[in-house]
Design a protein with these regions (language model features):
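Compositionally biased terminal segments of proteins
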Residues: 1-173
Length: 173
């Protein structure tokens, strides 16, 4: 079971990387800012990234289900010779109690007949101080990186501290 779980985690992380590469070639590469667990794991050099979803904030795009669907459709339509296809399964609003709106995109990715579910949580209006950075996201299985926008380390840490303080409960983040 452990090896099966590890294989599922590896495949999910690989598919999230594939999504990021599609993003890096899309018209939205300068609007989509990576944050959250996947970024933290990449920054500190964890090989076994076990985050359940991809977290991002969007700049200059309304965060409505319709606008996010157009954005994700454009990203997954980017043609890359990687053998991976994506399909949106559902899009719903999240963070109703938060100051800023958010959207959760549930997708499936397919690679060589293996179907892997993915979730992307998207927000807007987040303060990134002083600003987002160009980040060279190192791929797990290839000796190269993807150029994407990401939170700077200070904002990642500040957001994690805010989560701990405002929720006043222990969570997995």
């Amino acid at each position: 079971k452990e090896k099966s779980a590890d294989a599922h985690i590896l495949m999910r992380n690989y598919m999230m990387e594939r999504f990021l590469e599609h993003l890096s070639f899309s018209e939205y590469r300068d609007r989509f800012v990576l944050k959250g667990g996947m970024l933290v794991a990449a920054m500190v050099g964890l090989d076994a990234r076990s985050t359940m979803d991809l977290d991002a904030t969007i700049k200059g795009v309304n965060v409505s289900t319709e606008d996010v669907e157009k954005l994700i459709d454009a990203i997954i339509a980017v043609l890359i010779d990687d053998g991976v296809s994506f399909q949106i399964k559902s899009i719903m609003e999240i963070m109703d109690e938060a100051e800023y709106p958010g959207i959760r995109v549930s997708m499936t990715s397919v690679f060589d007949s293996v179907v892997t579910p993915l979730k992307i949580d998207i927000s807007t209006g987040d303060a990134i101080t002083p600003k987002e950075v160009r980040y060279r996201f190192k791929l797990m299985l290839e000796d190269r990186s993807i150029d994407i926008l990401a939170y700077n380390l200070e904002t990642v840490l500040a957001e994690k501290l805010e989560t701990i303080i405002t929720r006043t409960v222990t969570n997995t983040r």
